[in-house]
Amino acid sequence: MAWPGPLLLKDRKGRAYLVFPKEGGVFHHHKGSVPHEALLEAGPGGVVRTHLGEELSVHRPTLEEYLLHMKRSATPTYPKDASAMVTLLDLAPGMRVLEAGTGSGGLTLFLARAVGEKGLVESYEARPHHLAQAERNVRAFWQVENVRFHLGKLEEAELEEAAYDGVALDLMEPWKALEKAALALKPDRFLVAYLPNITQVLELVRAAEAHPFRLERVLEVGWREWEVRLPVAHPRFQQVGHTAFLVALRRWKAS
């Protein structure tokens, strides 16, 4: 029997569960259990029932769903921010991109899918346990070999000059990586930083003035979900609030 990658199960209340099917495995729900073999037989789009009769729908997780339910060793980059970073970086298939602050690998997956199988993501993480978890998360979801993981800091890496089409930073002190990022980034391409608080933004913008970068924009990404149950519609009571500021810098040719 061929075992697929991760599957997502949803119960009648919309609660989601990420499952990695394996031979002899069993998924346990508070309303019963179901063998992993049954999940494979149902397949994505199918339905299974636990031994107590609870109905579960079977899905192949989207990238957003996988990021929200995968194991984490660090606070994740939310999907709304990760997709916005890909847009701000203006990534396309075949490009090469640098990432610093791999964390749990969520943003890494968005970058890897954006550059495609002919592109490359070089991801740097200073903490070994974060890097190990990120590698497991990425390999489990993404079978394309277009990500290289590096243990260490970007500012200490040996990088080829003007060889990368984008730089994505998720660091507490991203200004320390600006010099190396400026060296590696192609002219007229972008560096995008993910920063939780505005004091970090001010520090980064101030530091960028000493390097060949120009500030393009600083933004927050809103995300407002609605509850629609005909004939009633209203915003959901629980909303995702502030997650981070995104800072986009453009590399220019130094005179």
Curated annotation (Swiss-Prot):
Its EC number is 2.1.1.220. S-adenosyl-L-methionine binds at residues 104-107, 125, 130, 155, 170. It comes from Thermus thermophilus (strain ATCC 27634 / DSM 579 / HB8). This is tRNA (adenine(58)-N(1))-methyltransferase TrmI. Contains a large catalytic C-terminal domain that binds S-adenosyl-L-methionine and a smaller N-terminal domain that may play a role in tRNA recognition. Domains are connected by a linker region. One of its GO terms (molecular function) is tRNA (adenine(58)-N1)-methyltransferase activity. Catalyzes the S-adenosyl-L-methionine-dependent formation of N(1)-methyladenine at position 58 (m1A58) in tRNA. Homotetramer composed of a dimer of dimers. PROSITE patterns: SAM_TRM61. The gene is trmI.
